[in-house]
Amino acid sequence: MAESDLWSVDANSALELSLVEPTEDGLTTVTRFHPRFTYPLFGEEEQIFGYQDLKINLQYHAPDMRPNVKITHSKKFKSIGETQPTDLDALLQGYLPPVAFAKKREFEDAIRLMPADWTPPGEILSEFDGVDGAKFEIRRSNLADDASRQIIDRVQLLILLFIEGGSYIGTDTTDSLDRWDIFFLYNIKPSTTDGTSRYQFAGYSTVYKFFPLQRFPLEPKEAHENLELPSGEFPFSNLRSRTRISQFLILPPFQKSGNGSRLYRTIYDYCLRDPNVIEVTVEDPNEAFDDMRDVADLDFLRQKSEFTDLRINTDIHIPKQGAAPRGVVDEVKSEEARCLYRIAPRQFSRVLEMHLMSRLAETVRPTLVDDKVVAKPTKIETHEYDLWKLFVKQRLYRHNKEVLSQLDRHDRIERLNETLGSVELEYARILALAERRTQATSSNLKRKLDDDENTEGSSSKKARVEDA
């Protein structure tokens, strides 16, 4: 083993994060977890040089996410020339607020001073029951709010540790703070002693408003001559805007329970109620977020007649030569539905394609199972499938026109067919995921109804609640 290997530590293992709460006997750990990756801090190799038995314990006070860092090790490398151990304090100070480096006693004293009836900043948008009886709350605030901005400053490091390509948002430029909305997800734990509820931070999302240039109808000359600018302050909220989901994080202990979908759905519903929001977009989503978003949007739109009424026009004939026909799906009604529900064009097209694929006959519908035995398709079923493929190819061509236009006709057709095959598999996977989510939701609802019936049949509801 090389000398350097003796002094190199895997950063993902060395760094442990935890949520803690104070008790009469000291701090108690609510949950602990390790980062998904640490390359934004320690480089591509995710190694920390200069220590043996290194432990970096980053504790967060569960309600307000006040951080505290504790670093321990058995040995530290003695510097030789330019070869020096990683300066962990200096490195972490670039990512955490100064309060994170207070002594442990100061940290414990500070969090003990938090009032028992403390509540997170912002207005309550949603309350729901999670798995195993867990209760959650989603609140909305704004980055211009001091308490909310303080929490964001404390937790932004988590974005780098769990979101591929994640980045900080600026909290120092006061003139743009009110463009940022913040949506907090909290797990609520009722106290067994004083009747209050304890909040545990479970995740959050930041949403940015930007204001596109808009076209306005020409007005008579008199209107321009009499134009008066509004006096006083003019809030950004009064302007037509697009909203962009920027950061979106659910802490690992609260993942895989539908909490991400709940948070996304709440953000979308909030934006949908705002008459000034033109469109809801997402900034550089990763694959996991894309899947969650696809399933959530599909579930939502399938409840809307403006969407479900969109169908493939099977009266259209596909010529063997010449230009491909348009209007496979009514373009006007499709655009009206998209604008009504303020979904970005590409996202709406994808979800519509998924939905239409799910309505194809089983004899022609693409699936993840290659050897599935099905009946021979009829001509009508095959024709509808051909029209669906044409509909998808037309979008793919528009989206990749610059690249595809440089290929000859044969290569262009081959490339489109290859891409279509990948799209079919992707849609089949997402539709299967949506089906599993629907079944899980139905199962959870049935279990909850059964529990409610048992509770109503109890001779002492109060005792049952307290025992729980």
Swiss-Prot record:
One function term, GO molecular function aspect: histone acetyltransferase activity
Listed Pfam families: Hat1_N
Binding positions for acetyl-CoA per the UniProt entry: F248, L249, I250, Q255, K256, S257, G258, N259, G260, S261
Knockout-associated phenotype: Significantly attenuates virulence toward rice leaves by affecting appressorial penetration and infectious hyphal growth. Impairs the acetylation of ATG3 during germination and weakens the interaction between ATG3 and ATG8. Also abolishes the acetylation of ATG9 and thus impairs the ATG9 binding ability to vesicles during nutrient starvation induction.
Catalytic center residues: E283 (proton donor/acceptor)
Keyword RNA-binding appears in the UniProt entry: no
EC number(s) per entry: 2.3.1.48
Mutagenesis or variant effect for S8A: Impairs phosphorylation of HAT1, and promotes the interaction with SSB1 and translocation from the nucleus to the cytoplasm
The organism's place on the tree of life at top rank: Eukaryota
GO biological process: autophagy; DNA repair; subtelomeric heterochromatin formation
Catalytic reactions on record: L-lysyl-[protein] + acetyl-CoA = N(6)-acetyl-L-lysyl-[protein] + CoA + H(+)
Post-translational modification: Phosphorylated at Ser-8 by GSK1 in the nucleus which impairs its translocation to the cytoplasm through interfering the interaction between HAT1 and SSB1. Dephosphorylation under nutrient starvation conditions promotes the interaction between HAT1 and SSB1 and results in the translocation of HAT1 from the nucleus to the cytoplasm in order to acetylate ATG3 and ATG9.
Post-translational modification Phosphoserine, affected residues: S8
Annotated region (Interaction with histone H4 N-terminus), positions in chain: 44-46, 208-210
UniProt-annotated stretches for the region Disordered: 442-468
Coiled-coil ranges per UniProt: none
General function of this protein: Catalytic component of the histone acetylase B (HAT-B) complex. Has intrinsic substrate specificity that modifies lysine in recognition sequence GXGKXG. Involved in DNA double-strand break repair. Required for appressorium turgor pressure, autophagy and conidial nuclear degradation. During the germination process and upon starvation conditions, translocates from the nucleus to the cytoplasm where it acetylates ATG3 at 'lys-262' and 'Lys-267', thus influencing autophagy through controlling ATG3-ATG8 interaction.
Assembly behavior: Component of the HAT-B complex composed of at least HAT1 and HAT2. The HAT-B complex binds to histone H4 tail. In the nucleus, interacts with GSK1 and SSB1. In the cytoplasm, interacts with ATG3 and ATG9.
Protein's name in the database: Histone acetyltransferase type B catalytic subunit
Organism from which the protein derives: Pyricularia oryzae (strain 70-15 / ATCC MYA-4617 / FGSC 8958)
